[in-house]
Protein backbone atom coordinates (compact mmCIF):
# COMPACT_ATOMS: atom_id res chain seq x y z
CA UNK A 1 0.00 0.00 0.00
CA UNK A 2 2.85 2.37 0.74
CA UNK A 3 4.04 1.96 -2.86
CA UNK A 4 0.60 2.99 -4.08
CA UNK A 5 0.63 6.09 -1.91
CA UNK A 6 4.04 7.12 -3.27
CA UNK A 7 3.24 6.36 -6.91
CA UNK A 8 2.22 8.80 -9.62
CA UNK A 9 -1.56 8.87 -10.22
CA UNK A 10 -1.33 7.03 -13.55
CA UNK A 11 0.66 4.20 -11.94
CA UNK A 12 -1.71 3.54 -9.06
CA UNK A 13 -4.39 1.41 -10.79
CA UNK A 14 -1.82 -1.18 -11.87
CA UNK A 15 -0.32 -1.25 -8.37
CA UNK A 16 -3.76 -1.80 -6.85
CA UNK A 17 -4.28 -4.73 -9.23
CA UNK A 18 -0.86 -6.09 -8.26
CA UNK A 19 -1.77 -5.83 -4.57
CA UNK A 20 -4.93 -7.85 -5.13
CA UNK A 21 -3.44 -10.30 -7.65
CA UNK A 22 -2.77 -13.08 -5.09
CA UNK A 23 -6.53 -13.17 -4.49
CA UNK A 24 -7.45 -13.51 -8.17
CA UNK A 25 -8.05 -17.23 -7.69
CA UNK A 26 -11.21 -16.35 -5.76
CA UNK A 27 -12.77 -15.45 -9.10
CA UNK A 28 -11.63 -18.43 -11.16
CA UNK A 29 -15.26 -19.11 -12.09
CA UNK A 30 -15.64 -15.74 -13.87
CA UNK A 31 -14.96 -16.11 -17.61
CA UNK A 32 -12.05 -13.87 -18.52
CA UNK A 33 -11.39 -13.02 -14.87
CA UNK A 34 -12.19 -9.76 -13.11
CA UNK A 35 -10.59 -6.35 -12.76
CA UNK A 36 -9.05 -6.57 -9.30
CA UNK A 37 -9.09 -2.79 -8.94
CA UNK A 38 -12.90 -3.03 -9.11
CA UNK A 39 -12.79 -5.71 -6.42
CA UNK A 40 -10.78 -3.29 -4.28
CA UNK A 41 -13.57 -0.73 -4.55
CA UNK A 42 -16.29 -3.31 -3.89
CA UNK A 43 -14.50 -4.24 -0.67
CA UNK A 44 -14.52 -0.63 0.58
CA UNK A 45 -10.82 -0.21 -0.19
CA UNK A 46 -9.21 3.24 0.04
CA UNK A 47 -9.68 5.59 -2.92
CA UNK A 48 -6.35 5.59 -4.76
CA UNK A 49 -7.54 8.38 -7.05
CA UNK A 50 -8.05 10.81 -4.17
CA UNK A 51 -5.28 10.14 -1.70
CA UNK A 52 -5.33 12.32 1.39
CA UNK A 53 -3.18 12.69 4.50
CA UNK A 54 -5.87 10.72 6.34
CA UNK A 55 -5.17 7.67 4.19
CA UNK A 56 -1.45 8.00 4.81
CA UNK A 57 -2.16 8.21 8.54
CA UNK A 58 -4.30 5.08 8.29
CA UNK A 59 -1.50 3.08 6.71
CA UNK A 60 0.92 4.33 9.36
CA UNK A 61 -1.47 3.24 12.12
CA UNK A 62 -1.58 -0.28 10.69
CA UNK A 63 2.21 -0.35 10.51
CA UNK A 64 2.59 0.96 14.06
CA UNK A 65 0.08 -1.63 15.29
CA UNK A 66 2.15 -4.42 13.68
CA UNK A 67 -1.10 -5.42 11.99
CA UNK A 68 0.24 -7.81 9.37
CA UNK A 69 2.37 -9.82 11.81
CA UNK A 70 -0.43 -9.96 14.36
CA UNK A 71 -2.86 -11.31 11.78
CA UNK A 72 -0.30 -13.84 10.57
CA UNK A 73 0.38 -15.03 14.12
CA UNK A 74 -3.35 -15.32 14.86
CA UNK A 75 -3.97 -17.37 11.73
CA UNK A 76 -1.07 -19.68 12.52
CA UNK A 77 -2.48 -20.17 16.01
CA UNK A 78 -5.93 -20.91 14.61
CA UNK A 79 -4.64 -23.32 11.97
CA UNK A 80 -2.62 -25.19 14.59
CA UNK A 81 -5.79 -25.65 16.66
CA UNK A 82 -7.68 -27.14 13.72
CA UNK A 83 -4.82 -29.39 12.69
CA UNK A 84 -4.58 -30.71 16.25
CA UNK A 85 -8.17 -31.96 16.29
CA UNK A 86 -7.84 -33.82 12.95
CA UNK A 87 -11.26 -32.67 11.76
CA UNK A 88 -11.00 -34.43 8.41
CA UNK A 89 -11.05 -31.11 6.59
CA UNK A 90 -8.14 -30.13 4.39
CA UNK A 91 -6.68 -26.98 5.96
CA UNK A 92 -5.71 -24.89 2.92
CA UNK A 93 -2.64 -22.80 2.29
CA UNK A 94 -3.88 -19.26 2.75
CA UNK A 95 -3.57 -16.14 0.64
CA UNK A 96 -4.43 -13.27 2.99
CA UNK A 97 -4.76 -9.59 2.14
CA UNK A 98 -5.10 -6.79 4.68
CA UNK A 99 -6.21 -3.52 3.06
CA UNK A 100 -6.90 -0.05 4.37
CA UNK A 101 -10.53 0.97 3.92
CA UNK A 102 -12.10 4.17 2.62
CA UNK A 103 -12.64 6.68 5.44
CA UNK A 104 -15.03 8.72 3.28
CA UNK A 105 -17.50 5.84 2.86
CA UNK A 106 -20.22 6.47 5.43
CA UNK A 107 -21.59 2.93 5.36
CA UNK A 108 -18.14 1.46 5.89
CA UNK A 109 -17.22 3.86 8.66
CA UNK A 110 -20.53 4.20 10.49
CA UNK A 111 -22.72 1.19 9.78
CA UNK A 112 -20.10 -1.58 9.75
CA UNK A 113 -17.63 0.43 11.82
CA UNK A 114 -14.52 0.10 9.72
CA UNK A 115 -14.61 -3.63 8.95
CA UNK A 116 -15.35 -5.61 5.81
CA UNK A 117 -13.86 -9.09 5.60
CA UNK A 118 -14.44 -12.29 3.65
CA UNK A 119 -13.12 -15.80 4.17
CA UNK A 120 -15.75 -17.99 2.56
CA UNK A 121 -13.65 -19.33 -0.34
CA UNK A 122 -11.11 -21.97 0.59
CA UNK A 123 -7.57 -20.62 0.60
CA UNK A 124 -8.40 -16.90 0.46
CA UNK A 125 -9.07 -14.26 3.12
CA UNK A 126 -9.54 -10.53 2.59
CA UNK A 127 -9.70 -8.04 5.45
CA UNK A 128 -10.48 -4.37 4.84
CA UNK A 129 -10.29 -2.13 7.88
CA UNK A 130 -10.13 1.40 9.12
CA UNK A 131 -7.75 1.40 12.10
CA UNK A 132 -9.96 2.64 14.91
CA UNK A 133 -8.86 1.62 18.38
CA UNK A 134 -11.63 -0.98 18.43
CA UNK A 135 -10.63 -2.51 15.11
CA UNK A 136 -6.95 -2.57 16.05
CA UNK A 137 -7.81 -4.27 19.32
CA UNK A 138 -9.75 -6.96 17.44
CA UNK A 139 -7.34 -7.74 14.57
CA UNK A 140 -6.55 -11.26 15.76
CA UNK A 141 -10.21 -12.05 16.40
CA UNK A 142 -11.21 -10.70 12.99
CA UNK A 143 -8.62 -12.94 11.33
CA UNK A 144 -9.64 -16.17 13.06
CA UNK A 145 -13.33 -15.43 12.46
CA UNK A 146 -12.56 -15.52 8.74
CA UNK A 147 -10.34 -18.57 9.21
CA UNK A 148 -13.28 -20.51 10.66
CA UNK A 149 -15.33 -19.69 7.56
CA UNK A 150 -12.42 -20.74 5.36
CA UNK A 151 -12.02 -24.12 6.97
CA UNK A 152 -15.77 -24.78 7.13
CA UNK A 153 -15.97 -24.37 3.36
CA UNK A 154 -12.74 -26.19 2.49
CA UNK A 155 -12.64 -29.72 0.99
CA UNK A 156 -14.02 -32.18 3.52
CA UNK A 157 -16.20 -29.52 5.12
CA UNK A 158 -19.54 -27.98 4.19
CA UNK A 159 -20.26 -27.61 0.48
CA UNK A 160 -21.35 -24.07 -0.42
CA UNK A 161 -23.63 -23.87 -3.46
CA UNK A 162 -24.50 -20.20 -4.04
CA UNK A 163 -27.82 -21.12 -5.65
CA UNK A 164 -29.14 -23.52 -3.01
CA UNK A 165 -27.43 -22.41 0.20
CA UNK A 166 -29.83 -21.16 2.86
CA UNK A 167 -29.90 -18.10 5.06
CA UNK A 168 -29.74 -20.59 7.93
CA UNK A 169 -26.33 -21.81 6.78
CA UNK A 170 -24.94 -18.28 6.64
CA UNK A 171 -26.42 -17.34 10.02
CA UNK A 172 -24.99 -20.44 11.69
CA UNK A 173 -21.66 -19.92 9.98
CA UNK A 174 -21.41 -16.40 11.41
CA UNK A 175 -22.34 -17.66 14.85
CA UNK A 176 -19.72 -20.41 14.72
CA UNK A 177 -17.04 -18.00 13.51
CA UNK A 178 -17.76 -15.49 16.27
CA UNK A 179 -17.80 -18.22 18.91
CA UNK A 180 -14.50 -19.61 17.61
CA UNK A 181 -12.97 -16.15 17.84
CA UNK A 182 -14.17 -15.86 21.44
CA UNK A 183 -12.70 -19.27 22.26
CA UNK A 184 -9.30 -17.85 21.32
CA UNK A 185 -9.65 -14.16 22.22
CA UNK A 186 -12.48 -13.78 24.71
CA UNK A 187 -15.08 -11.05 24.21
CA UNK A 188 -12.94 -9.45 21.50
CA UNK A 189 -14.19 -12.28 19.32
CA UNK A 190 -17.67 -10.84 18.92
CA UNK A 191 -18.15 -8.84 15.72
CA UNK A 192 -18.11 -5.25 16.90
CA UNK A 193 -20.63 -3.73 14.48
CA UNK A 194 -23.36 -5.83 16.12
CA UNK A 195 -24.81 -3.80 18.98
CA UNK A 196 -25.54 -5.32 22.38
CA UNK A 197 -29.16 -4.27 21.92
CA UNK A 198 -29.30 -6.31 18.74
CA UNK A 199 -27.56 -9.31 20.30
CA UNK A 200 -30.07 -9.57 23.14
CA UNK A 201 -33.21 -8.77 21.16
CA UNK A 202 -35.67 -11.67 21.06
CA UNK A 203 -37.67 -10.03 18.27
CA UNK A 204 -34.55 -9.85 16.10
CA UNK A 205 -33.93 -13.53 16.75
CA UNK A 206 -37.51 -14.46 15.85
CA UNK A 207 -37.39 -12.35 12.69
CA UNK A 208 -34.15 -13.97 11.52
CA UNK A 209 -35.60 -17.41 12.26
CA UNK A 210 -38.44 -16.62 9.86
CA UNK A 211 -35.97 -16.25 7.00
CA UNK A 212 -33.72 -19.25 7.61
CA UNK A 213 -35.11 -21.37 4.77
CA UNK A 214 -34.63 -18.68 2.10
CA UNK A 215 -32.20 -19.93 -0.54
CA UNK A 216 -29.65 -18.27 -2.80
CA UNK A 217 -26.85 -16.09 -1.47
CA UNK A 218 -28.13 -13.16 -3.53
CA UNK A 219 -31.01 -12.99 -1.02
CA UNK A 220 -28.90 -13.02 2.15
CA UNK A 221 -27.86 -9.42 2.70
CA UNK A 222 -30.85 -8.14 4.64
CA UNK A 223 -31.20 -11.28 6.76
CA UNK A 224 -27.53 -11.51 7.73
CA UNK A 225 -26.14 -7.97 7.54
CA UNK A 226 -29.34 -5.98 7.97
CA UNK A 227 -31.43 -3.43 6.11
CA UNK A 228 -28.73 -0.76 5.76
CA UNK A 229 -26.48 -3.13 3.82
CA UNK A 230 -29.44 -4.40 1.81
CA UNK A 231 -30.28 -0.89 0.66
CA UNK A 232 -26.64 -0.21 -0.21
CA UNK A 233 -26.46 -3.26 -2.46
CA UNK A 234 -29.91 -2.88 -4.00
CA UNK A 235 -31.62 -5.67 -2.06
CA UNK A 236 -35.01 -5.55 -0.36
CA UNK A 237 -34.95 -4.57 3.35
CA UNK A 238 -36.81 -6.92 5.68
CA UNK A 239 -36.88 -4.89 8.90
CA UNK A 240 -33.63 -5.96 10.57
CA UNK A 241 -30.82 -3.95 12.19
CA UNK A 242 -27.18 -4.16 11.16
CA UNK A 243 -25.63 -7.51 12.08
CA UNK A 244 -28.93 -9.22 12.88
CA UNK A 245 -27.81 -12.52 11.41
CA UNK A 246 -24.63 -12.46 13.45
CA UNK A 247 -26.59 -11.79 16.63
CA UNK A 248 -29.05 -14.61 15.94
CA UNK A 249 -26.32 -16.97 14.84
CA UNK A 250 -24.31 -16.42 18.00
CA UNK A 251 -27.29 -17.15 20.25
CA UNK A 252 -28.23 -20.27 18.33
CA UNK A 253 -24.69 -21.60 18.15
CA UNK A 254 -24.03 -20.92 21.82
CA UNK A 255 -27.17 -22.86 22.78
CA UNK A 256 -26.11 -25.77 20.56
CA UNK A 257 -22.54 -25.87 21.84
CA UNK A 258 -23.69 -25.88 25.46
CA UNK A 259 -26.16 -28.70 24.80
CA UNK A 260 -23.71 -30.75 22.75
CA UNK A 261 -20.75 -30.16 25.04
CA UNK A 262 -18.78 -29.05 22.01
CA UNK A 263 -16.77 -26.06 20.81
CA UNK A 264 -16.97 -23.97 17.66
CA UNK A 265 -13.65 -25.45 16.60
CA UNK A 266 -14.89 -29.02 17.04
CA UNK A 267 -18.17 -28.14 15.30
CA UNK A 268 -16.57 -26.47 12.29
CA UNK A 269 -18.30 -28.85 9.87
CA UNK A 270 -21.52 -29.41 11.81
CA UNK A 271 -24.53 -29.10 9.48
CA UNK A 272 -26.51 -25.93 10.05
CA UNK A 273 -29.80 -27.83 10.26
CA UNK A 274 -28.42 -30.10 12.99
CA UNK A 275 -27.40 -27.05 15.01
CA UNK A 276 -30.76 -25.38 14.44
CA UNK A 277 -32.81 -28.46 15.36
CA UNK A 278 -31.06 -28.68 18.71
CA UNK A 279 -30.72 -24.97 19.45
CA UNK A 280 -34.13 -23.64 18.45
CA UNK A 281 -36.21 -25.45 21.11
CA UNK A 282 -33.69 -24.47 23.77
CA UNK A 283 -34.43 -20.84 22.93
CA UNK A 284 -38.19 -21.38 22.83
CA UNK A 285 -38.27 -21.35 19.03
CA UNK A 286 -39.43 -23.70 16.32
CA UNK A 287 -37.34 -24.84 13.38
CA UNK A 288 -38.89 -26.85 10.56
CA UNK A 289 -35.90 -27.06 8.21
CA UNK A 290 -35.00 -30.10 6.18
CA UNK A 291 -31.67 -31.73 5.42
Predicted regions and their residues:
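N-terminal low-structure segments adjacent to metalloprotease catalytic domains
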Residues: 1-66
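Auxiliary, metal-adjacent structural segments of Zn-dependent hydrolase domains
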Residues: 58-121, 136
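Conserved mixed alpha/beta catalytic, RNA-binding, or beta-rich assembly cores of soluble enzyme
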Residues: 123-125
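Short pre-active-site segment immediately N-terminal to the catalytic Zn-binding motif
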Residues: 128-143
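Active-site recognition of the HExxH zinc-binding catalytic motif
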Residues: 141-157, 174, 178
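Post-HExxH zinc-binding segment in Zn-dependent metallohydrolases
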Residues: 163-207, 211, 283-288
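Pan-zinc metallopeptidase signature
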Residues: 209-291
